[in-house]
C-alpha cells in the first residue's frame, strides 16, 4: 500500500508501517501516550457519545448551545456519524438537543475522559516531552494521512508537535478517507480486529473496494 491512515491511536500504526517511526519507538510512545491520557485526566465527570444521522455543522452548532458545561465534536468518523466529548452533563444535554434537531440515534459511549479535546492539554504537553526521545525518519514512498487535518505528513512537518496536538484535537477520519479517494485510491484494507473502519469507509463512499484482515497471511493474500 502506498498510502495509509489510522483512527486516533491507529495513526501510530500507519506511521510505523510507513517507517516514519521505528517499531520499537512506536511501542514505547504508544504506551506513554496511554499512561499520560489516564494520569493527566482533568478532575470531573466525563463522557462521549456517538451522534448518528446529522450533518457535522448542526452537531457543531448544537454543542455551542449547550449550557451545562463543556462539549465539542471529537471524532468525525464518516458521513452521518460524529462522536462528541466533554463533561457528562453537557454530553447528555447535547444528546437531547441533537435528538430534537433530527439525529437518528444518540449513543453514550463507555469512555472515561474528554478525549481529543483541549481538556487533555497537560497530557499533550507530557507526550510532547516524551516524543523528544524518539527518532522521526524521512518520509519515503509510503504516505500517511494525519487525523488532525486530513492532509499528508511531509518532511517539513513538526511531526512530534502534531502527534502531541493529536490528543487535543478532533479526529478527521471522514475527510482523511475523502482525501485518499481524491488521490485515486479505490481499494482500502482495514488491518485489525473487527470491521468498524471498513464500515466508516463504506458510509463515506460506497463505491470503494474494502477488505478486512487481522493477520499477516490474509493480508498478503489480499495484496
Language-model features: locations:
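Short glycine-aspartate micro-motif
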Residues: 4-6, 26, 73, 188-190
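Acyltransferase/transacylase module recognition
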Residues: 1, 129-132, 136-223
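Gly/Ala-rich beta-loop-alpha elbow adjacent to hydrolase catalytic centers
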Residues: 2, 6-10, 22
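Conserved functional loop/turn residues at catalytic and ligand-binding sites
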Residues: 8, 102, 184
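Glycine-rich beta-strand-to-loop/alpha-helix junction loops that act as flexible
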Residues: 9, 87, 191-193
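Alpha/beta catalytic cores of group-transfer enzymes, especially the acyltransferase/condensing modules
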Residues: 17-168
Amino acid at each position: 500500500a502506498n498510502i495509509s491512515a489510522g483512527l486516533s491511536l491507529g495513526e501510530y500504526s500507519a506511521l510505523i508501517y510507513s517507517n516514519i517511526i521505528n517499531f520499537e519507538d512506536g511501542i514505547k510512545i504508544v504506551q506513554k501516550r496511554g499512561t499520560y491520557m489516564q494520569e493527566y485526566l482533568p478532575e470531573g465527570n466525563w463522557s462521549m457519545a456517538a451522534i448518528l444521522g446529522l450533518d457535522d455543522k448542526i452537531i457543531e452548532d448544537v454543542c455551542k448551545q449547550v449550557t451545562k458545561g463543556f462539549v465539542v465534536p471529537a471524532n468525525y468518523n464518516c458521513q452521518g456519524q460524529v462522536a462528541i466529548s466533554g463533561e457528562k452533563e453537557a454530553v447528555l444535554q447535547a444528546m437531547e438537543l441533537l435528538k430534537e434537531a433530527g439525529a437518528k440515534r444518540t449513543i453514550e459511549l463507555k469512555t472515561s475522559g474528554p478525549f481529543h479535546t483541549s481538556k487533555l492539554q497537560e497530557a499533550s504537553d507530557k507526550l510532547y516531552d516524551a516524543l523528544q526521545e524518539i527518532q522521526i525518519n524521512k518520509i519515503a514512498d509510503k504516505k500517511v494521512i494525519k487525523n488532525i487535518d486530513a492532509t499528508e505528513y511531509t518532511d517539513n512537518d513538526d511531526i512530534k508537535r502534531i502527534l502531541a496536538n493529536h490528543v487535543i484535537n478532533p479526529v478527521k477520519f471522514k475527510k482523511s478517507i475523502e482525501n485518499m479517494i481524491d488521490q485515486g485510491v479505490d481499494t482500502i484494507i482495514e488491518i485489525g480486529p473487527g470491521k468498524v473502519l471498513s464500515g466508516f469507509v463504506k458510509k463515506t463512499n460506497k463505491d470503494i473496494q474494502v477488505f478486512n484482515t487481522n493477520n499477516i497471511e490474509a493480508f498478503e493474500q489480499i495484496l
